[in-house]
Amino acid sequence: MNYEQLSALVIQWGEDKGIFAKSTPLRQLDKTQEELNETKEALEKLASLTNQEILDDVLLSDDFGNISLEEDALAEAKDGIGDMLVTIILLAKMVNMDSVDCLEAAYDVIKKRTGKMVDGQFVKD
């Protein structure tokens, strides 16, 4: 499925769950923040794993479907990023915008932006 198809399914899901009728853009933004925090925790967990912990986990796993700590943290991060996308798609719809249009508008602003990396973050000029 492409992004537009998935977005339409997310919007229909939100409609079916009553999110548009019973929530507000600010409450949806709170949900986005909640998902962002969960994603940050998963990425921090991934970053804190040492090679020895990963190796120990892999060596201790059996053939019964156990996954390593690293794979678990990656799965949590993937879930968190997906959940953030869902909340952003719903938020855009709540304010009568299309998330793809929002992304395109943001890209149009940043595509020629100059700046530099400072402490692992891009800082615009």
Task: Label the predicted regions.
Residues M1-I81, L85-D125:
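Flexible "arm" and connector segments at domain edges
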